[in-house]
Amino acid sequence: MQVKTLLGATFLALSLASCSTVEKVVYRIDVPQGNYLEATTVAQVKEGMTAQQVQYLLGTPVLVDPYNSQTWYYVFLQQRAYETPVQHTFTVKFDQRGIVTETHLDKPLPQVSQQGENNTIIETGEKPKSSWWKFWK
């Protein structure tokens, strides 16, 4: 009888352990990786710009095509707290003189006004100022 009770309690404990929601209690930060791309800066890249101008706007590319050095890849991976990561790839192609001939963005980037903040400051109310001198009086 005790063996059945012990096995039943063990089975119940192990089966309920997977039903936990504790994962969402732990704070996770937003993790941007790669080149941080903003819609406003990507929109400034136009055909006819030089490679130096593109690099000034967007920074060093994450990847330069090893077979064709005239193609630059800017990769931006954004993972917000418990959401699935979203990857944006911006491709810039140059001609032999280093002039932009083509640009391609695989997914639209969120506008700056649409980007939500995960860091909210909670006001607790104002504390009255008290001096430590009151202990000496």
Swiss-Prot record:
The topology of this chain with respect to the membrane is: Lipid-anchor
Sites of N-palmitoyl cysteine lipid attachment are: 19
Name the keywords, alphabetized. Cell outer membrane, Lipoprotein, Membrane, Palmitate, Signal
Localisation: Cell outer membrane
Taxonomically, the superkingdom here is Bacteria
GO terms classed as biological process: Gram-negative-bacterium-type cell outer membrane assembly; protein insertion into membrane
Q: Which GO MF terms does the UniProt record name?
A: protein-macromolecule adaptor activity
- A Pfam family: BamE
InterPro entries, sorted: BamE, BamE-like, BamE_dom
GO-annotated cellular components: Bam protein complex
Q: Where is the lipid attached (S-diacylglycerol cysteine)?
A: 19
Leader sequence range is 1-18
Q: Which HAMAP family match?
A: OM_assembly_BamE
Describe the function of this protein. Answer: Part of the outer membrane protein assembly complex, which is involved in assembly and insertion of beta-barrel proteins into the outer membrane.
What family does the database annotate?
A: Belongs to the BamE family.
PANTHER family annotated for this entry? OUTER MEMBRANE PROTEIN ASSEMBLY FACTOR BAME
Protein name per its UniProtKB record: Outer membrane protein assembly factor BamE
Originating organism: Haemophilus influenzae (strain ATCC 51907 / DSM 11121 / KW20 / Rd)
User: What is this protein's gene name?
Assistant: bamE
